[in-house]
């Protein structure tokens, strides 16, 4: 997933790496937060778009593989990350054009947590549906 975003939105990837380095001494402090990054118009992922994309980095686990957080913790961190994202989108919508349908903010995302974190998609999906955003889920 990260490789795809790095290729499509290299400007955001650089900022994401810097953000993670700033928090390297306490990566757990990022859990339940979302880092929303505005991409640059020159990023390949913005080709043909009317407005530049924003990339939301949701911190739901601070490790993967055997060291990953429990599924319950990841789902809870997803819920908290979504609350954080919603508040950022509400502020952003006051000054920037963002994708909306019938006045509801739209978020496009892959099936998060289902890959390296091995959380059943249905558990993540149930949390996402609680939030006041329209989510378009795609499979890569």
List the predicted regions and their residue ranges.
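Macrodomain-like recognition of ADP-ribose-binding/processing modules
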Residues: 1-140
């Amino acid at each position: 997933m990260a490789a795809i975003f790095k290729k499509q939105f290299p400007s955001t990837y650089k900022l994401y790496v810097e953000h993670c380095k700033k928090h390297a001494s306490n990566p757990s402090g990022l859990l339940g937060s979302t880092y929303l990054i505005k991409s640059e118009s020159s990023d390949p992922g913005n080709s043909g778009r009317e407005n530049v994309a924003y990339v939301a980095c949701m911190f739901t686990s601070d490790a993967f593989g055997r060291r990953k957080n429990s599924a319950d913790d990841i789902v809870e961190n997803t819920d908290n990350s979504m609350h954080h994202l919603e508040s950022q989108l509400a502020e952003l919508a006051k000054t920037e054009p963002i994708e909306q349908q019938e006045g509801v903010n739209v978020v496009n995302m892959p099936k998060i947590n289902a890959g390296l974190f091995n959380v059943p998609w249905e558990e993540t999906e149930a949390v996402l549906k609680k939030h006041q955003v329209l989510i378009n889920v795609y499979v890569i």
